[in-house]
From Swiss-Prot:
Single biological process term from Gene Ontology: translation
Pfam families reported in the protein's UniProt record: KOW, ribosomal_L24
Sorted UniProt keywords: Ribonucleoprotein, Ribosomal protein, RNA-binding, rRNA-binding
SUPFAM superfamilies named in the record: Translation proteins SH3-like domain
Underlying gene: rplX
Transmembrane segments: none
Complex and partners: Part of the 50S ribosomal subunit.
One annotated GO molecular function: rRNA binding
Claim: Secreted is one of the keywords in the record: no
Annotated SMART domains: KOW
Gene3D superfamilies the record matches: 2.30.30.30
Protein name: Large ribosomal subunit protein uL24
GO cellular component terms, semicolon-separated: ribonucleoprotein complex; ribosome
Length: 106
């Protein structure tokens, strides 16, 4: 299994698919499926029957998972999509960094 470069809370850029060119914050990473749920990206309509939780029922909009290969982390310095690397910092901890600018990604 490969390492995941995207974590919950990251700002990501969509590089393929229907929402190509948009950016959003990662709400959840689905490790087993190699997918992530991103705020405002890949929004689908879900038809729900009336139930105790939602007595009205109807159509609700929600974000569907998108594959991690279609996402790039946004560089905190330039605001553009970048690849991610890992290196040891001064304290000896492994941190993620932007390959474009060398800036550490929190």
């Amino acid at each position: 299994m490969s390492k995941l470069h995207i974590k919950k809370g990251d700002i990501v850029f969509v590089n393929a698919g229907e929402d190509k060119g948009k950016t959003g914050r990662v709400l959840q990473v689905l490790v087993k499926d190699n997918r992530a749920i991103v705020e405002g990206i890949n929004v689908v309509s879900k038809h729900t029957k009336p139930n105790a939780k939602n007595p009205q029922g109807g159509i609700e909009k929600k974000e569907a998972p998108i594959h991690l290969s279609n996402l790039n982390v946004v560089d905190p310095k330039s605001g553009k999509a970048t690849r991610i690397g890992r290196k040891l910092n001064e304290k000896g901890a492994l941190v993620r960094y932007s390959k474009k600018s060398g800036e550490e990604i929190k």
